[in-house]
């Protein structure tokens, strides 16, 4: 019969009849069950008003509200639902449309008492038809109410539908609170699903409710609603509210919703549900529209096999009756599938679809779709089979329609998809109890795909880049499963291949593939390291790997497709998610979706009927783990997976660690940090372990756990952290086995924990995971550092033990590193507070070996530069590993940590200024951990750090000390700090009085600097020569920027800092090697800096007095402003990080908070003393690092910061510093306008602040030249040091302002870094890099597009200037309005001149605009380099075409053209700088190739040298001009060097040419103004 009834049509097309009674909508025990975590357990009520025949919805005070027509309705108020109203509950992906239509009620349904009552039989006959039509109509409808009459059935159907919707949502992950970032994306999928699902589902709901509508059920099944129904009858009728709902309801619901969303896909999903997670993992593949369904059959699941799976799963689900009812249609579908073997491509496409679309979706969502189990598992294979068969028909038809378009794409990826299906199948197998049929399927699949292993490996590697870790875990579990059963073994192998696609590491990764992966990673913000972790794939899994690779490619291709079919996504989330889809989804979903659905799902999976013992365990546990680690997308769904690629074998981890770095830059720092370190340390071991099959499952698991723990540390890392034992596995077979066992235990525990955590509200899970992640991160780092020592222990250890073992391991690692501070251990305990290298909350015992203590001071000789570099890389990795989730907290922690570190260092120095021995480690860090103190100490710490750095040089390296080490071995810092502190007051007082005093102070400062070598100079320069300090600081800043950039981007509390410290230290050590030449006296300076603590007590009063009181001169006013700004910036870096995190314009942020922070401790610190300045520089470096400033930006920023704070620092000082820094610094410093803007005169300090560009331009060219020229030589540095020392002493007087400026800038940098991390990730990082002068950073972070554009313009100008600086240093210098024009001579002459320019030493403080300019400069330079590279590539291509017919050495040319991939990566955490360097290197190579093409014999070169170059430059197009200019730049302006060449933009090149033609300073400013943010010239004529 039909009756008029109200329906809620979900966006997936599922119609839920609204019973004529009150129904509850929610996640638990509700008639209309929604799977979205954003939906409360009892979310809303839909009541029926019989008098008006209307349904009313009332929100039950839900967290996320109920929305009618996208308007949140008031709580506890009934709102009448009108026709076509759009109803949404929370942020559930199901948008229900209120539809009224006739519903044909099946006779069986009519017989159902409840249904009859509700329907009021008079209308029953037409209800079914109406239902069909309504479901067809309301594809977009997403109503949370289930038909009351069909409450159980409808509820389950709704659950199923909503699951489908939720799957769309859940894969994306709905946040517990707030609108998901992906909101609205699912409806497309839902629409598709609805098309397939709508009719059958409604019938199913109706029939299912009555339980008599077998036909309806069949129809429902056919449309994948049947799949749900099968689940639901099992779940609904037996115990709709009881066990099925609770136990399986969520997964089942998710599955159902998946099915509803993708009915066709859901057919296999029902299989999965019915299969009990086993044989119908293929069903998961079907999660993708029709994929799972076809997958089961296409996966070589004969109907017998399917039946076996179904039979196996029936035990899981008691759906026998339903199964029987559905068997007819299901069998028909299955038979049809078996006979016709609908193209695997169909379900593969579905899988691919789910991959691409659902790749962002959490695995468990995919699983839900595929499984169609409210409980997360389809209990019966039969059900799965029946659902599959029933829904497979519709699904296949739907998919045929849907995927014929996809088919073409999928055909390419078909083999991959098959492999993915295998992976999915194995995943399903893991989930389900049917290992054998699944194994067969997997085997068949793995055998079927004959995709070339290289391509598959490449694709696989791509996917395993993000996939690797999780597949590793899954493979571990799968290996376990292999042990469990032979078929399981096959599945495991397949799963390993699928999940373990990452298992095989491409021995010869395609450079193109790698590049493509990099590009993809970049696109998804995951591109930190160019070395992507490539999965170490077992030979036996190569096929699967191929499949996975193909599927990855398919997933990538389909990523843009709406993943209407999430069935495969489900299984792929389990297995394939581990694979290609994961890597895609990890990035895409990480980028877009950062929710915890995956956690939820994983928990569901853990709680799923199948324990963790089989593939299910692997799929659930392993998948969860892998999901956590490998399937970043899963993580993003479950817990907003950290943007950490799945943990590959450690060998690959190291590669992937870089990728993970990128990912983690957006991800939590700590998580990635640890992972990358671990990966670094144990990649080979992991690889070997992967190769060992016996150990492989566990080792993979461990690795996966480890990698995941590291990677997704914030996700469900506690469990994953057991994976930290992966290094242990890598250590040795024995350790591996032990670790495997322990890890297995730990994994089980973790899984339990995860289940608990996941079952707990998402927020709770997030918190748990976050805490765990931090711990795990730290622990993992230790483990990675010391995999042999702690692995087994760590495996055994669960969360705490892992932490402990990691503490020990970290300690050992620290010992090994000799840079990792004791803080590493504490890092675990106090995740947010502890800095690994910088300090530990707990005060270190004097007993702690110096090696363990990060050297606050630059360990010039303490730690080998290689160690330092290793630490730096580790630190960088670690920082990159930090999870984005914890990035906010981490950023704040990082800033606090930096502040604390500064305070501690200041305190340490204070404590150790008398005793400069290694006792420093025992200094009371706790006392110095005052946030406010930090702010003050932030700057002061550098000063204190000067002393303590030496003392703790080998004990601890703090950012400050590292920074100091870099800036000056740290001794100078102390000395300078001391002199600065005294000189600070004096300066404040004497600044106005006389520069002579400054000169005298500078002389003293120089003495310190000289005595301490170059190291001290930077410290002194902090006060006097911001740039001088900036150079070392820049070096450190670069290092730290590099490290801390990551850290700040992924603030990991102290850990990132520690890592950054270590990293900086390592970098500094590298720099120290260069600086060492200049600063052999570092230790000597230590004693000198004993005085440094003195300013500490007076810092606040002194700085404030200096800022506001005695030194209230105009210069002091500048200093005051600078100090205020610096203060603000320091505060910003320390306290303001949240501000930086805000999306407020950086400019706004910097502007607002600075004023707010005028009285902040930072200002005091800044004005307090040179020490503070040193600290400020250090902090700036930290801030830069935090802000993700790259090496170059750091230097640039630091100098600029210094310029702002201490504009007086002479360029020669900066040059010297640059030279001292060496080529590394040079690269950083080529952009360091600070040298340029570091005017020599105090007037310049004020005036150049306004016109710093010119000054910078003048100075910068020489300085940059010096840097470039003396990069390799320390001699110019020594001479420069003398000058700088003098200048510094003058500058020390102005140090207060400068230091305040520095502090402010560092604060800004921190803010910007935060903003970058939060908002732009990589791009912001670039800005951050350019933002080293924290203003820009803060501004960039805070500034909206317009502000950023302005900044970009600034940057462009700065960038152009930087190019110009190098090109026309003399002109610029001669044009310097200051009396320091003499400096405009040669870089070295300038270096010599600085002494003459003590006035110059009083650099004009750069205005915030200028600082921004630097930030923008870095950003713009980065963009320019990119543009230049692109244009050069284009030009090279064009030239190649032009000259292809000519006789050329094309092999050589092509190799040159491809050489960019071979460009050595500069060790810099600044993605911007490294990217710029890479781009410029590529440009250089391309230009070389172009040169070879154009002028193979050098005739043109000769002509050009004879005088045609001027004609050549203008003649070629801008792109070519840039190349030409770049090409000739070596001859024309060697000082420009690579950085300039890279920076050379077409416009910039022309500008550079003009500058080379001795353009006037006015021209510089014109160029600055002329260049748009793009670097394009606004007015070419102006340039002309």
Swiss-Prot record:
Keyword Cytoplasm tagged: yes
Compositionally biased spans, kind Basic and acidic residues: 595-604, 650-659, 668-698, 728-739, 797-816, 906-916, 1060-1072
Ranges for region Targeting to centrosomes: 1113-1584
Location relative to the cell: Cytoplasm, Cytoskeleton, Microtubule organizing center, Centrosome; Cytoplasm, Cytoskeleton, Microtubule organizing center, Centrosome, Centriole; Cytoplasm, Cytoskeleton, Spindle
List of residues that carry Phosphoserine: 138, 141, 356, 359, 446, 466, 497, 571, 580, 630, 633, 636, 667, 725, 838, 879, 881, 930, 933, 958, 1019, 1059, 1112, 1114, 1132-1133, 1145, 1160, 1165, 1198, 1205, 1210, 1239, 1241, 1251, 1270, 1280, 1362, 1521-1522
Compositionally biased spans, kind Low complexity: 860-873, 971-982, 1073-1103, 1122-1138
Subunit structure: Interacts with CCDC68 and CCDC120; leading to recruitment to centrosomes. Interacts with PLK1. Interacts with NIN. Interacts with FHDC1. Interacts with CCDC61. Interacts with TBK1; efficient complex formation may be dependent on the presence of CCDC61.
Name under which the protein is recorded: Centrosomal protein of 170 kDa
Source organism (scientific name): Homo sapiens
């Amino acid at each position: 019969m039909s009756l008029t009834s109200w329906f809620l049509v979900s966006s997936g097309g599922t119609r839920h009849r609204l019973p004529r009674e009150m129904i509850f909508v929610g996640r638990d025990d509700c008639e209309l069950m929604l799977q979205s975590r954003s939906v409360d357990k009892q979310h809303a009520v839909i009541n029926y008003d019989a008098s008006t025949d209307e349904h009313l919805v009332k929100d039950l005070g839900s967290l996320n509200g109920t929305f009618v027509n996208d308007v949140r309705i008031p709580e506890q108020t009934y709102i009448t639902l009108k026709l076509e109203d759009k109803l949404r509950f929370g942020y559930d992906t199901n948008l229900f449309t209120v539809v009224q239509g006739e519903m044909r009620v099946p006779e069986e349904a009519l017989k159902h008492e409840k249904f009859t009552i509700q329907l009021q039989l008079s209308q029953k006959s037409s209800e079914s038809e109406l239902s069909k039509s309504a479901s067809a109509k309301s594809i977009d409808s997403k109503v949370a109410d289930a038909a009351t009459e069909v409450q159980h059935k409808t509820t389950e159907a709704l659950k199923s539908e909503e699951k489908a919707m939720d799957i769309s949502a859940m894969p994306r992950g709905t946040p517990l609170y707030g609108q998901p970032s992906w909101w609205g994306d699912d409806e497309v999928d839902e629409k598709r699903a609805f098309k397939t699902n709508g009719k059958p589902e409604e019938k199913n709901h109706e029939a299912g409710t009555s339980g008599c509508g077998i036909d309806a059920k069949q129809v429902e099944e056919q449309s994948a609603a049947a799949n749900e129904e099968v689940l639901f009858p099992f779940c609904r009728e037996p115990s709709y509210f009881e066990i099925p709902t609770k136990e399986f309801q969520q997964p089942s619901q998710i599955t159902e919703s998946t099915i509803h969303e993708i009915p066709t896909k859901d057919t296999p999903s029902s299989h999965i549900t019915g299969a009990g997670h086993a044989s119908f993992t293929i069903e998961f593949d079907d999660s993708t529209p029709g994929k799972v369904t076809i997958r089961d059959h296409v996966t070589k699941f004969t109907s017998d096999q399917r039946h076996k799976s179904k039979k196996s799963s029936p035990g899981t689900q008691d759906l026998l009756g339903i199964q029987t009812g559905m068997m007819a249609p299901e069998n028909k579908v299955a038979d049809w599938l078996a006979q016709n073997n609908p193209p695997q491509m169909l379900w593969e496409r579905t899988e691919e679809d789910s991959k691409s679309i659902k790749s962002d979706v959490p695995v468990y969502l995919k699983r839900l779709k595929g499984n169609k189990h409210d409980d997360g598992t389809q209990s019966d294979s039969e059900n799965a089979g029946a659902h599959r068969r029933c829904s497979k028909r519709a699904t296949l038809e739907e998919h045929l329609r849907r995927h014929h378009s996809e088919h073409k794409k999928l055909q390419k990826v078909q083999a991959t998809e098959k492999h993915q299906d295998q992976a999915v199948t194995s995943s399903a197998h893991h989930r389900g109890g049917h290992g054998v049929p699944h194994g067969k399927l997997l085997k068949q699949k793995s055998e079927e795909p004959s995709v070339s292993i290289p391509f598959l490996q490449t694709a696989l590697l791509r996917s395993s880049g993000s996939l690797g870790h999780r597949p590793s875990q899954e493979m571990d579990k799968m290996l376990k499963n292999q042990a469990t059963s032979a078929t399981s073994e096959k599945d495991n192998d397949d799963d390993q291949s699928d999940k373990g696609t990452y298992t095989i590491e491409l021995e010869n990764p395609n450079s193109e593939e790698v590049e493509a992966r990099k590009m993809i990673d970049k696109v998804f913000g995951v591109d930190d390291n160019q070395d992507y972790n490539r999965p170490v794939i077992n030979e036996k899994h190569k096929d699967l790997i191929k499949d996975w690779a193909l599927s990855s490619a398919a997933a990538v291709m389909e990523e843009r497709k709406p993943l209407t079919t999430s069935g495969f996504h489900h299984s792929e989330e389990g297995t394939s998610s581990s694979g290609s889809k994961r890597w895609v989804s990890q990035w895409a979903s990480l980028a877009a979706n950062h929710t915890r659905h995956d956690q939820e799902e994983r928990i569901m999976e853990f709680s799923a009927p199948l324990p963790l013992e089989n593939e299910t365990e692997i799929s659930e546990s392993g998948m969860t783990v892998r999901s956590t680690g490998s399937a970043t997308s899963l993580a993003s769904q479950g817990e907003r997976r950290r943007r950490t690629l799945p943990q590959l074998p450690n060998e690959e981890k190291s590669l992937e660690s870089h990728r993970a770095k990128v990912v983690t830059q957006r991800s939590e720092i700590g998580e990635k940090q640890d992972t990358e370190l671990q990966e670094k340390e144990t990649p080979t071991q992991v690889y070997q372990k992967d190769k060992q099959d016996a150990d492989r499952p566990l080792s993979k698991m461990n690795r996966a756990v480890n990698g995941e723990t590291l990677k997704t540390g914030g996700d469900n890392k506690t469990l994953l952290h057991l994976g930290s034992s992966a290094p242990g596995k890598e250590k040795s077979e024995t350790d591996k086995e032990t670790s495997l066992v322990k890890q297995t235990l730990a994994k089980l525990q973790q899984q339990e924990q995860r289940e608990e955590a996941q079952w707990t509200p998402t927020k709770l899970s997030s918190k748990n995971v976050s805490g765990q992640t931090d711990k795990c991160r730290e622990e993992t780092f230790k483990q990675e550092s010391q995999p042999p020592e702690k692995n087994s222990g760590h495996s055994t250890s669960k969360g705490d033990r892992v932490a402990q073992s990691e503490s020990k391991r970290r300690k050992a690692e620290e010992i090994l590193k000799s840079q990792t501070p004791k803080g590493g251990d504490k890092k675990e305990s106090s995740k947010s507070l502890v800095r690994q290298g910088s300090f530990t909350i707990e005060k270190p015992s004097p007993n702690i070996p110096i090696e363990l203590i990060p050297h606050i001071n630059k360990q010039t000789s303490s730690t080998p530069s290689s160690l330092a570099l290793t630490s730096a890389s580790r630190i960088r990795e670690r920082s990159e590993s930090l999870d984005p989730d914890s990035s906010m907290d981490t950023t704040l922690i990082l800033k606090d940590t930096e502040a604390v570190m500064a305070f501690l260092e200041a305190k340490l120095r204070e404590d150790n200024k008398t005793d400069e021995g290694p006792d420093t480690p025992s200094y009371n860090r706790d006392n110095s951990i005052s946030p406010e103190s930090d702010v003050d100490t932030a700057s002061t710490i550098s000063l204190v750090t000067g002393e303590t750095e030496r003392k703790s040089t080998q004990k601890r390296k703090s950012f400050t000390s590292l920074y100091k080490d870099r800036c000056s071995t740290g001794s100078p810092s102390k000395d300078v700090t001391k002199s600065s502190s005294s000189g600070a007051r004096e300066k404040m007082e004497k600044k106005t009085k006389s520069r002579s005093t400054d000169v005298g102070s500078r002389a003293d400062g120089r003495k310190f600097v000289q005595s301490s070598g170059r190291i001290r100079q930077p410290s002194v320069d902090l006060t006097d020569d911001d740039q001088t300090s900036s150079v070392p600081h820049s070096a450190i800043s670069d290092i730290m920027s590099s490290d801390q950039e990551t850290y700040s981007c992924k603030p990991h509390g102290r850990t990132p800092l520690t890592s950054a410290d270590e990293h900086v230290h390592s970098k500094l050590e590298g720099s120290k090697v260069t600086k060492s030449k200049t600063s052999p006296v570092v230790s000597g300076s230590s004693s000198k800096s004993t005085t440094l603590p003195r300013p500490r007590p007076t810092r606040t009063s002194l700085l404030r007095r200096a800022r506001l009181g005695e030194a209230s001169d105009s210069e002091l006013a500048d200093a005051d402003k600078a100090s205020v700004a610096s203060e603000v910036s320091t505060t910003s870096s320390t306290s303001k990080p949240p501000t930086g995190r805000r999306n407020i314009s950086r400019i706004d942020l910097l502007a607002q908070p600075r004023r707010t922070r005028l009285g902040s401790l930072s200002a005091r610190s800044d004005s307090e003393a040179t020490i503070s300045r040193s600290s400020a520089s250090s902090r700036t470096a930290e801030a830069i690092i935090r802000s993700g400033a790259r090496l170059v930006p750091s230097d640039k920023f630091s100098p600029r910061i210094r310029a702002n704070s201490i504009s007086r620092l002479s360029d020669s000082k900066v040059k010297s510093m640059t030279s001292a820094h060496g080529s590394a610094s040079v690269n950083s410093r080529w952009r360091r306008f600070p040298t340029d803007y570091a005017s020599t005169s105090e007037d310049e300090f004020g005036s150049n602040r306004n016109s710093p560009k010119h000054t910078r331009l003048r100075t910068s060219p020489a300085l940059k030249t010096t840097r470039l020229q003396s990069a390799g030589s320390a001699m110019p540095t020594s001479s420069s040091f003398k000058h700088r020392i003098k200048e510094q002493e003058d500058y020390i007087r102005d140090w207060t302002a400068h230091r305040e400026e520095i502090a402010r800038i560092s604060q800004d940098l921190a803010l910007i870094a935060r903003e970058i991390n939060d908002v732009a990730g990589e791009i912001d990082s670039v800005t951050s890099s350019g933002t080293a002068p924290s203003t820009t950073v803060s501004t960039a972070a805070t500034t909206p597009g317009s502000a950023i554009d302005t900044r970009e313009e600034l940057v462009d100008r700065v960038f152009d200037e930087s190019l110009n600086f190098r090109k026309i240093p003399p002109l610029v210098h001669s044009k310097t309005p200051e009396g320091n024009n003499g400096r405009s001579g040669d870089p070295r002459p300038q270096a010599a001149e600085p002494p003459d320019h003590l006035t110059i030493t009083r650099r004009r403080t750069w205005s915030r605009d200028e600082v921004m300019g630097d930030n923008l400069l870095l950003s713009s330079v980065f963009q320019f380099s990119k543009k230049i590279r692109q244009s050069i590539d284009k030009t090279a291509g064009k030239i190649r075409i032009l000259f292809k017919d000519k006789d050329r050495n094309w092999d050589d040319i092509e190799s040159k053209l491809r050489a960019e991939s071979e460009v050595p990566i500069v060790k810099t955490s600044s993605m911007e700088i490294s990217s710029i360097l890479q781009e410029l290197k590529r440009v250089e190579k391309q230009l070389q190739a172009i040169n070879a093409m154009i002028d193979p014999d050098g005739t043109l070169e000769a002509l050009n040298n004879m005088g045609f170059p001027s004609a050549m430059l203008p003649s070629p197009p801008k792109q070519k001009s840039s190349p030409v200019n770049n090409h000739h730049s070596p001859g024309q302006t060697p000082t420009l060097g690579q950085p300039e060449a890279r920076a050379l933009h077409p416009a910039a090149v022309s500008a550079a040419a003009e500058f080379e033609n001795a353009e006037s300073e006015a021209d510089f400013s014109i160029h600055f103004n002329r260049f748009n943010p793009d670097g394009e010239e606004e007015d070419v004529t102006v340039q002309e």
